[in-house]
Design a protein with these regions (language model features):
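Short amphipathic alpha-helix that is part of the acyltransferase structural core
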Residues: 2-43
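A short helix-loop-beta-strand connector motif used in the catalytic cores of GNAT acetyltransferases and
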Residues: 49-61, 92
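Conserved beta-strand in the GNAT
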Residues: 61, 69-79, 97
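A conserved beta-turn-beta hairpin within the catalytic core of GNAT-like acetyltransferases
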Residues: 70, 81-93, 103
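Conserved acetyl-CoA binding element of GNAT-fold acetyltransferases
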Residues: 87-100, 149-153
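Conserved acetyl-CoA-binding loop-helix of GNAT-fold acetyltransferases
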Residues: 98, 104-117, 141
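Conserved active-site alpha-helix within GNAT-family acetyltransferase domains
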Residues: 109, 121, 125-126, 132-156
């Protein structure tokens, strides 16, 4: 197996600006293995990646071959400043996904480790995430504990 490189999506776009549409396409295809995705204009995609970079980071795992690369995994962390806990931060981990072909190879652990490292660098006192019941064991193996319940109200 080729080596997987872990890099922020923002840095990947900066490094390969001529491949923006390819990167966007691969990233959305990967996310579609996690949830519903719809078409997004390239300008909006770039704007949102930049916005997320202001408050956190999207990490992608790529297989880099000599002439091309493939995005095979991703995870996002958003940093929330808090008034409690001496003003320290909370890291919100979102959108963890590994392509079906690459699951079971420890890639999600590496993505989570990278995101937790960012959380420590950003003075977070904890990281939290929501997940479906059928994958909670993956997160428990990576140091997470079940706490409370997720609640949501969708507007669309």
């Amino acid at each position: 197996m080729s080596e997987i490189i872990y890099i922020s999506l923002n840095d990947l776009l900066i490094r390969y600006p001529e491949l923006t549409d390819t990167i966007k396409g691969q990233y959305l295809l990967l996310l579609s293995e996690l949830t519903y995705t719809s078409y997004i204009e390239t300008s909006m995609f770039l704007k949102n990646v930049e916005k997320i970079s202001e408050f956190g980071c999207i990490i992608v795992g790529i297989i880099n071959n000599s002439s091309s690369f493939e995005i095979v995994a991703s995870g996002t962390i958003i940093i929330e400043p808090k008034i409690i806990r001496e003003g320290r931060n909370v890291g919100h981990i979102e959108d963890i996904v590994v392509s079906k072909e690459m699951r079971g190879k420890g890639i999600s652990q590496k993505i989570l480790d990278k995101l937790k490292s960012i959380a420590r660098e950003k003075n977070c006192y904890k990281v939290i995430l929501d997940c479906d019941d059928d994958v909670k064991k993956v997160y428990m193996k990576n140091g997470f504990n079940v706490k409370g319940f997720q609640m949501a109200e969708y507007f669309d």
